[in-house]
Regions:
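Beta-strand-rich N-terminal accessory domains
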Residues: 48-135, 143-156, 161, 168, ...
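Active-site-adjacent "subsite" loops/lids of carbohydrate-active enzymes
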Residues: 303, 372-426
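Active-site groove signature of glycoside hydrolases
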Residues: 329-340, 416-445
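N-terminal export signals
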Residues: 22-46
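N-terminal secretory signal peptides
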Residues: 1-22, 46
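Active-site-proximal substrate-binding groove within the catalytic cores of carbohydrate-active enzymes
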Residues: 76-77, 95, 256, 455-668, ...
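Acidic, His- and aromatic-enriched active-site or binding-groove loops in soluble protein domains
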Residues: 353-360, 393-405, 491-505
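Conserved structural scaffold segments of CAZyme catalytic domains across common CAZy folds
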Residues: 132-386, 569-612, 621-627, 636-641, ...
């Protein structure tokens, strides 16, 4: 369950707010039957789909750090930075792009702090309290974050302002094999409250910079390099030739408390921006990409109504039997959406669950899965929302105009404790957090700057408890890739489901879903990975408006289109009794295909046109093992799309030049393969509403 998302404030600059279409004008072109759409293309920086760092690659690009005289250097063959510490004053000196044999722009300051009275404190005006330190970072094979599974180097400098109000610990971090360098700062108030209002981590002048998106938390791109404050609420902006990456703050910094922020600078091979940036995202996100197939109760047993333990068990057993036992499908979770709680309490089970999720957990384990649960930080929707708010106000839980205030200390504790109890008592492996609340306003007495800030801290606490937890952060998010430092997926925007274009209700639903993705994500956040969206799944359920039947036999098209997106959050909003054996077979075939091709589908990116305009479109992904192309025609007339696999797959220079394409689906087994040659256009005819899936192997 989700709702229309809140609009994100764009970065504050004339050249901020570049749409993906504008951004991709600098890339290569794919011709389609209705015109041409620009695609930003590139070759992998590390020789496979994402340049995933294995032992050999990390060994080829080891991080090194040195401290000599008044210089501190951190780097590898891809990127190197040097800072000076002359007379105890810390300043950036130079940065080198080893991939492109060029220099990178250097800020005058490592950071700048701005206070409520508009005064500023530069890093160079602070005084080092100890000599620079360098240390090795050990690889932790059990870490959730992939970068932490790789060794590296870290340099650290501690400093204080001359008034003795603030201590800052600055660190430069580089992991082996990385083509990016991260800057981390920890700020601590020493005596009295410090009215800190803004932290700037990147500020310099450079021509031809751009922000490839219209939402906050979008990286700045300059040629083959990128710069960003690593936070979804940050303002990464371009104003003329001035580049700034900064983060506002509302609350004063209390004595003894600390806050942490970070930034990144990365380099890419020419034409490689999307894929090489995706490499960075995959390494630094909370958890790497993974397929996560699960049932969701919304539209089935719950739709603004309460359901029971018996209802949940029936759904678990139906899906477990049909998919896991009969068809050998791996199921990851069974998520119970709105309706499990008594909305006249606050996140307590309704009377239909006398033992909580105890029976649910046992049932999911029979099929190799675990329970998941929906919770809404702001309290949900409709009458259940009104009931929760009314009860919450009586009990003293904090509220704001959106509903509950997660930044309120009392409510935060109840919400956090409920989440931790779900993990500890019932083995919950997934949270769907639906509706986060205020992005900027602070609740009086809160330790958090906003409800979103509270949500980020909450997720951190939950991941400490369960590192492989799946977190789906829905309403209120937008396509900043830095949400993925905390959550596994975010909402595509728009309605849960609606209809667009022409054809049957199911075809119009597919068009609506994909058009929303194109408009809200592909165009608004060029560097956000499509693989990490909540798309609102496959829908065939008894309480889903106009999607409780399939008179046009379009369900197979919906399922193949859905898995072709490469999304890792694979949701089934399905009533088991409505499906035929053939429907179950389709889901099973596609789910197995997706899981076995995750190493390729992680690279999924958009190709073609605008579904809303009934233009043919789809998704392409490539790895050294194969290429995958999924295409759809949203029109009731046949249309052509012209594909050059070199451009569609962003082939590296050493990749094969010829491919044989065939469908992976059993119904097309025996169909002769079709040859594609890199650098040559090939016209593909798509019949009305056709969904075509092609796997391409090198000749």
């Amino acid at each position: 369950m989700a709702d229309n998302r809140d609009p994100a404030t764009p970065a504050d600059s004339p050249r901020s707010g570049v749409t993906r279409r504008d951004f991709l004008d600098r890339g290569s072109r794919i011709a389609i039957g209705l015109g041409a759409l620009q695609l930003g293309l590139g070759r992998s920086a590390f020789g496979d789909v994402l340049g995933m760092v294995g032992k050999s690659r990390a060994g080829e690009l080891p991080a090194e750090s040195t401290i000599a005289a008044d210089e501190v250097t951190l780097g590898n063959a891809s990127i190197t930075a040097t800072w000076t510490t002359t007379s105890g004053s810390f300043r950036p000196a130079k940065m080198t792009d080893g991939l492109n044999k060029s220099s990178l722009p250097v800020p005058a300051q490592a950071f700048v702090l701005t206070f409520a009275d508009k005064t500023t404190l530069n890093a160079s005006d602070m005084r080092m309290t100890s000599p620079p330190q360098t240390e090795s970072l050990a690889a932790d094979p059990t870490a959730s974050r992939k970068s932490e599974r790789v060794a590296g180097r870290k340099v650290t400098i501690s400093m204080r302002d001359t008034a003795g109000r603030i201590e800052v610990v600055w660190s430069g971090v580089l992991r082996d094999g990385s083509a990016y360098l991260r800057q981390e700062i920890t700020i601590r108030a020493l005596e009295g409250e410090v009215p800190l209002r803004e932290i700037s981590l990147v500020d310099f002048n450079a021509p031809n910079a751009m922000v490839p998106g219209t939402v906050r938390g979008t990286p700045i791109v300059i040629g083959t390099s990128y710069f960003a404050f690593e936070h979804p609420l940050a303002n990464n902006g371009v104003d003329g030739d001035r580049i700034r990456c900064r983060m506002g703050r509302t609350l004063p910094l209390r004595p003894g408390t600390t806050i942490e922020f970070s930034s990144v600078v990365g380099v890419t091979h020419p034409g490689q921006l999307r894929r090489d940036f995706l490499t960075y995202v995959e390494r630094e996100r909370a958890h790497p990409y993974r397929t996560f197939l699960h049932y969701n109760s919304w539209y089935d047993i719950g739709y603004f109504n309460k359901y029971s333990d018996a209802d949940a068990l029936a759904a678990i057993n139906a899906f477990g039997t049909e998919l896991h036992q009969k068809r050998g499908v791996t199921l990851d979770s069974f998520l119970f959406d709105d309706g499990w709680d008594d909305s006249k309490t606050l996140w307590r089970f309704n009377s239909g669950f006398p033992n909580g999720f105890t029976n649910v957990e046992a049932a999911t384990h029979k099929y190799g899965a675990a329970p998941g649960v929906w919770m809404s930080p702001w309290g949900g929707y409709g009458q259940p929302h009104a009931d929760r708010i009314a009860y919450g106000k009586e009990q003293g839980f904090e509220t704001n105009k959106e509903g509950f205030a997660l930044s309120g200390p009392i409510y935060y504790k109840r919400f956090r404790d409920t989440c931790l109890d779900m993990i500890r008592r019932y083995g919950v492996n997934q949270f769907k957090f639906d509706g986060t609340g205020e992005t900027t306003n602070t609740f009086p007495g809160s330790p958090f700057d906003s409800d979103f800030d509270a949500a980020i801290h909450l997720i951190g606490e939950l991941r400490t408890e369960k590192p492989d937890l799946y977190v789906n952060l829905t309403t209120g998010t937008y396509p900043s890739p830095f949400w993925l430092r905390y959550a596994d997926s975010i909402w595509r925007g728009g309605e849960d489901h609606s209809f667009a274009g022409i054809g049957t209700s199911r075809q119009r639903w597919i068009t609506y879903r994909d058009a929303d993705t194109y408009e809200n994500v592909v165009r608004a956040g060029a560097l956000f990975p499509i693989n990490s969206l909540m798309l609102h799944g496959m829908i065939y359920a008894k309480q889903a408006h106009n999607l409780m039947t399939d008179p046009g036999n379009d369900f197979t098209s919906e399922v193949r289109d859905y898995f072709g997106t490469g999304t890792q959050l694979q949701e089934m909003y399905i009533t088991a009794s409505l499906l035929t054996p053939a429907n179950w077979d389709t889901i099973a075939e596609c789910a197995k295909w997706s899981r076995s091709n995750a190493d390729t589908l992680v690279d999924t990116h958009w190709v073609g046109g605008d579904p809303q305009r009934l233009q043919p479109y789809g998704w392409a992904s490539w790895s050294s093992r194969k290429g995958i192309l999924t295409l759809r025609n949203p029109s009731n007339v046949a249309q052509d799309i012209t594909i050059d696999v070199e451009r569609a797959f962003e082939l590296p220079p050493n990749a094969p030049r010829q491919f044989l394409a065939k469908s992976p689906w059993a119904q097309y087994r025996g169909t002769p393969p079709v040859r594609f040659r890199a650098g040559q256009d090939r016209k593909i005819r798509l019949e009305p509403f056709e969904v075509l899936t092609l796997e391409m192997s090198a000749v």
